[in-house]
């Protein structure tokens, strides 16, 4: 059950961080205004909080593993929201990152 909770928290963290960064980008680069920037800043703050809810106690391990989720999530966000079409190298790299997440977070360790 901890693994499912952890995965759900990684997905939530990715939505908050990537979505927050996208909102700031839209506010600044696309001149959509302060409301977009403010919403992005709030989402980014919530991302920081979501990471603390991971069942794993080691900050470094959680953040290292999250890096792989961020890579895959960013490509997925770009495909869904911005119409970006990842090529085979994007997909291969994202899969390698997700394998890394699995090893770092969920490999059996001695107690």
UniProtKB/Swiss-Prot annotation:
Keyword Cytoplasm: no
Location, primary (coarse class): membrane
Cited Pfam families: UPF0060
Residue stretches spanning the membrane: 7-27, 33-53, 62-82, 88-108
Membrane topology recorded in Swiss-Prot or TrEMBL: Multi-pass membrane protein
Gene Ontology CC entries for this record: plasma membrane
UniProtKB keywords: Cell membrane, Membrane, Transmembrane, Transmembrane helix
Protein location: Cell membrane
This protein's record includes keyword Membrane: yes
InterPro entries recorded: UPF0060
Family: Belongs to the UPF0060 family.
HAMAP family tied to this protein: UPF0060 (MF_00010)
Protein name per Swiss-Prot or TrEMBL: UPF0060 membrane protein Krad_3114
């Amino acid at each position: 059950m901890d693994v499912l909770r952890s995965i759900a928290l990684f997905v939530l963290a990715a939505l908050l961080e990537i979505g927050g960064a996208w909102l700031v980008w839209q506010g600044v680069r696309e001149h959509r205004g302060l409301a977009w920037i403010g919403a992005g800043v709030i989402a980014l703050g919530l991302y920081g909080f979501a990471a603390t809810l991971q069942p794993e106690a080691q900050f470094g391990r959680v953040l290292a593993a999250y890096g792989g989720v961020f890579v895959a999530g960013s490509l997925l966000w770009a495909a869904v929201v911005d119409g970006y079409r990842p090529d085979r190298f994007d997909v291969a790299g994202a899969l390698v990152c997700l394998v890394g997440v699995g090893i770092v977070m969920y490999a059996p360790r001695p107690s």
